[in-house]
């Protein structure tokens, strides 16, 4: 069966306000630029710009900001047929504080937000069957009714042979407590095909299934999660990232750049890697090099979604490899060898 979509995403859509007078305290900033935000939204835009057919399960406010999101998505050629409008909820707002190249913070307004109002009745099996891959963003598990909608989408995809990617995307301000986070993350992770998360996010996901997870290293987590998934990526900020499969381990460094801000690389990383994973799964070394290159490009950018075209990323990656041929290294590994 020919698939209409390469990816369908489900997750967070927000409005970001980033200061133009940056390297300043937020209380002293007076000029901001508005962007679409939220990890799932940013990844969707990134994937679409990489010439993938992209759909989205979501919910936005029935007002000017909701219209702004839908207009951006349509401009970016993302299908909006399964993004509903809600009159009683507003989109989350994020104000960024860029204090220095190294330090950035955010001020978020996420009470009763629109993106968490997607309901089980909004999840359409026919829509899921039209995609090759379903991408779930972990923030969408934070509250009902979105939580149940995500679980429905997960099991419909799994039971119909659709690959599931879990981008953990932990945001503490959306959750009641850590037990709730770990419980729902574990359910989704154990039913996914691919997991992407930071070391801290993987640790949080593992609290109920591994003893003393705070004392474990990346390899330990990989050995456990590869019992369930085909591939896991563990990110460690400036230390780089690691990709694991049952018989493969790749270690990627970060490409050093002069940063504008200390965030925004993760969504570009996911976009480039997932694009390459779909189109050329046999060459994951190159996919990881592209992903880490895209992340370095984005921390130099003012927004989190303004991904440059593929050719610029390719040139950046090629130059990075010339400077450091060991940007991505293959390590000896077998997850289940005793």
From Swiss-Prot:
Q: What are its E.C. numbers? A: 2.7.1.92
What terms describe the molecular function in GO for this protein?
A: 5-dehydro-2-deoxygluconokinase activity; ATP binding
Has keyword Amino-acid biosynthesis? Answer: no
* Keywords, alphabetical: ATP-binding, Kinase, Nucleotide-binding, Transferase
Catalytic activity from the UniProt record: 5-dehydro-2-deoxy-D-gluconate + ATP = 6-phospho-5-dehydro-2-deoxy-D-gluconate + ADP + H(+)
> Pfam families annotated for this entry?
PfkB (PF00294)
First and last residue of the signal peptide: none
Tell me the superkingdom of the source: Bacteria
Pathway given for this chain reads: Polyol metabolism; myo-inositol degradation into acetyl-CoA; acetyl-CoA from myo-inositol: step 5/7
Task: Output the NCBIfam families linked to this UniProt entry.
Answer: myo_inos_iolC_N
Q: What does this protein do?
A: Catalyzes the phosphorylation of 5-dehydro-2-deoxy-D-gluconate (2-deoxy-5-keto-D-gluconate or DKG) to 6-phospho-5-dehydro-2-deoxy-D-gluconate (DKGP).
Family named by the database record: Belongs to the carbohydrate kinase PfkB family.
Protein name (Swiss-Prot/TrEMBL)? 5-dehydro-2-deoxygluconokinase
Its gene is iolC
